[in-house]
Design a protein with these regions (language model features):
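Conserved Radical SAM active-site core
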Residues: 1-119, 123, 132-134
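Hydrophobic faces of well-ordered beta-strands that scaffold small-molecule active sites
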Residues: 25, 74, 101-103, 124-126, ...
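Conserved non-cysteine loop/helix-boundary elements of the Radical SAM core domain that shape
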Residues: 44-58, 77-88, 93, 109-110, ...
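Alpha-helical scaffold elements within enzyme catalytic domains, especially in hydrolases
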Residues: 65, 92, 116, 155, ...
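Active-site-proximal loop/turn and secondary-structure-junction residues that shape catalytic pockets
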Residues: 80-82, 107-109, 130-132, 180, ...
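Short low-complexity, flexible loop/linker segments enriched in glycine and/or proline
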Residues: 90-91, 117-118, 140-142, 259-265
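Non-cysteine beta-strand/loop elements that form the S-adenosyl-L-methionine
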Residues: 118-135, 201-210
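Auxiliary Fe-S-binding modules of radical SAM enzymes
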Residues: 161-275
Length: 275
């Protein structure tokens, strides 16, 4: 099986319990099951054929190279369309390493897909983007987003019901992310309501990093960053509901926190591995 990969490096911009002091060993896969008009990684998400072609053995060696550099974990970004071959790679990696595996996903995937990885994924890091089918259709071309994502997140919690954090670094568990969008705070509150109905309230990461990318510069709803008031409306509601988790400084809403997908960096890493 061939994977399409755009980046494989230590990443310091995840939640503190994921990035820690040394970085998260992050692998960005190309392609995506959604079509978010505001995607900040749109240059790799729009096509599964972008990036470099990587074999299963090469992917395994990339994992080991990140471990050797001190990564706190292996962080798989948008991996759902590779679940079956990933299972084979992860089974081999787990035999040789105790490093936690992070599954970083938009949550628009099947429960069956996730069950393939039961016992192989240590930390689930899903988004819950919307409850509103109108917003998910208008912004991501997926009217059934919540209908698929919510059961998927319940399955993630079934697999990893306890959050285990050692020396400030998560070893097992679930963190649900939510990106606050401009003019959409009521739906953000509905997202939190839905998460509060789970068997156990998950840790939540309420993100303020939205900024309009080129495709939505003139969008009637998405053409600006969120305001302090919008963000506080959501974080205050999370506090009322009793959530624990993570917030962001609004200064994070900048392209400076978007990773570089310069393929020469990945080519250089592959060359070092082979040498």
């Amino acid at each position: 099986m061939i994977f399409k990969v755009a980046r494989c490096e230590l990443h310091s911009w995840e939640e503190p319990v994921i990035s820690g002091t040394k970085g998260s060993g992050t692998v960005f896969f190309c392609g995506c099951s959604m079509r978010c008009v505001f995607c900040q990684n749109y240059n790799i998400s729009r096509s599964a054929n972008s990036g470099l072609s990587i074999t299963e053995d090469e992917l395994l060696q990339l994992f080991f190279s990140l471990e050797q550099e001190g990564a706190h974990n292996i962080n798989l970004v948008t991996p759902s369309h590779y679940a079956k071959p990933l299972k084979r790679v992860l089974e081999k990696f787990k035999k040789a390493s105790t490093l936690p595996i992070v599954y970083n996903t938009n949550a628009y995937e099947s429960v069956e897909n996730l069950k393939l990885l039961d016992g192989l994924v240590d930390i689930y890091l899903p988004d819950l983007k919307y409850v509103s089918s109108k917003l998910s259709l208008d912004f991501s071309a997926r009217a059934d987003y919540f209908e698929k994502a919510y059961p998927a997140i319940l399955e993630m919690q079934r697999q990893q019901p306890r959050n285990i954090i050692e020396n400030g670094i998560m070893q097992k568990g679930l963190i649900v992310r939510h990106l606050v969008l401009p003019n959409c705070t009521e739906d953000s509150k509905e997202v939190l309501d839905a998460l509060s109905r789970m068997p156990k309230k998950p840790l939540v990461s309420i993100m303020s990093q939205y900024f309009p990318t080129e495709p939505v510069m003139n969008h009637p709803v998405l053409n600006r960053k969120i305001s302090i008031r919008e963000y506080e409306k959501v974080t205050d509601y999370a506090s009322v509901l009793g959530f624990d988790g993570f917030t962001q400084d609004l200064k994070s809403a900048t392209v400076a926190y978007t990773p570089s997908f310069d393929l020469s960096i990945l080519k250089s890493r592959l060359k070092r591995i082979k040498d």
